[in-house]
Regions:
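Short, solvent-exposed loop/turn segments at secondary-structure junctions
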Residues: 63-66, 147-148, 196-198, 210-211, ...
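Non-heme Fe(II)/2-oxoglutarate
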Residues: 3-8, 12-34, 81, 219-221, ...
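Extracellular structured ligand-interaction cores
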Residues: 56, 143, 169, 184-190, ...
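Active-site rim elements
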Residues: 113-119, 176-178, 227-239, 258-261
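Non-heme Fe(II)-dependent double-stranded beta-helix
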Residues: 2-53, 60-178
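Double-stranded beta-helix
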Residues: 183-186, 196-256
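Secondary-structure boundary elements
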Residues: 131-140, 179-183, 192-200, 212
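Short, structured patches in soluble enzyme cores that scaffold and shape functional sites
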Residues: 145, 150, 174-176, 187, ...
Length: 357
């Protein structure tokens, strides 16, 4: 989880969003209580009401199914796996660390800047969906990866990862500290590259806990786990939203969620991780690191779990992705004010002083 910082940057949006890291934000009004000032672009009124009540929403066909298929094919190719030969999915390999081993078990694909990933990021319908939930269009896109999860057996068996009694649990957790007095705002998302089926596992969540969170929280002990909920799953059912290839699922960071294992015989679950957050154009070091990552195909450094491919780094495989006008703004290459972000005199937001309380 990000460590709270005293000095925050304000996003260049009408709604005041503040953040030190571009992952979690302080806002005057929580997203679940936000009153829309902009007309909805993609979500219906019912979609938006569901999002605010239950903490997630599925947006149909934000990219064509054919584009999702190309991303799936790329995920296979990037890892040197043959979709028709399951024995290639479990070949022995060396690991750089325990984290590297866990990421392999969970199915992470260490590619961040291929053109196909950027095509999804700069798709207008994807941006419009995140505009709807944040109620602002001045957003940055996350520089994240893919996931290709074969059946969790052999050297991908989750039993190889020691279970813990507290803290992170892959099957159900929060990605923010839910014991804070002022809860941080965070939005996450995935684009399905395969249709969901129960045996494939994949994204699952607890929408009823989100809906009743304030009442539930008031009854919990002061020393409860901040990121692992202890719940009765009959009272708070865990569900797996249905998705088709090309659909986008957006979820609130305060929605308890996780990933169920793949228990199928020989099928895979695949997604692209993709979210958008209010741009922090005054956070110059952050902006420059994002642009440099795109320019050089360097592994992003915004999260310690992003490792880059150990066998052949993506910077050695293909060239820089082309960006359209929207993509340049979503990266931070161009300011949402219309100025070139290379110009250090350009008005690109402001730095603010605020406190977490």
């Amino acid at each position: 989880m990000p460590t709270p910082a005293r000095y925050l940057h304000r996003a260049p949006s009408d709604i005041p969003y503040f953040s030190s890291d571009g992952e979690t934000y302080l806002a005057q009004t929580p997203l679940r209580d936000l009153k829309k000032s902009r007309p909805l672009r993609v979500l219906s009124e019912d979609d938006f009401a569901f999002w605010q009540s239950y903490g997630y929403v599925v947006v149909k066909q934000v990219i064509p199914a054919a584009s999702a298929r190309r991303l799936l094919d790329f995920a296979w190719e990037f890892q040197g796996l043959d979709p028709d030969r399951p024995e290639t999915w479990y070949e022995e390999r060396e690991y750089r660390s325990d984290l590297d081993r866990e990421l392999h078990i969970y199915g992470f694909v260490e590619a961040y800047h291929h053109q196909l990933l950027w095509d999804s990021r700069q798709a207008r319908r994807v941006h419009d969906a995140f505009v709807d939930v944040w109620d602002c269009e001045e957003l940055w896109v996350t520089l994240d990866r893919l996931n290709l999860n074969p059946p969790n057996i052999k050297n991908r068996d989750r039993a190889l990862i020691p279970r813990t009694e507290e803290g992170f649990d892959i099957e159900l957790h929060w990605d923010v500290d839910t014991t804070l007095g002022v809860l941080p705002q965070r939005v996450q998302g995935i684009i399905a590259l395969t249709d969901t089926r129960p045996e494939l596992g994949g994204f699952q969540c607890c929408p009823e806990l989100f809906r009743r969170f304030d009442r539930w929280k008031a009854l919990q002990p002061d020393d409860r786990d901040p990121i692992r909920p202890r719940i009765d799953r009959h009272e708070f059912p865990v569900v797996r939203p249905e998705m088709e290839a090309g659909d986008l699922l957006i979820f609130n960071g305060l929605l308890a969620h996780g990933v169920a294992p793949n228990t199928s015989e020989s099928s895979v679950r695949a997604v692209q991780y993709l979210s958008m957050m209010p741009a922090l154009e005054s956070a110059e070091a952050l902006r420059r690191s994002r642009v440099e990552s795109w320019r050089t195909l360097g592994t992003p450094d915004w999260n310690a779990t992003l490792l880059g491919d150990a066998t052949r780094h993506e910077s050695l495989r293909y060239g820089r992705a082309d960006l359209n006008e929207l993509g340049a703004r979503l990266l931070g290459l161009t300011s949402w004010s219309g100025a070139d972000a290379h110009d250090e005199t350009a008005p690109v937001g402001e730095e603010s002083c605020a406190e977490f309380v």
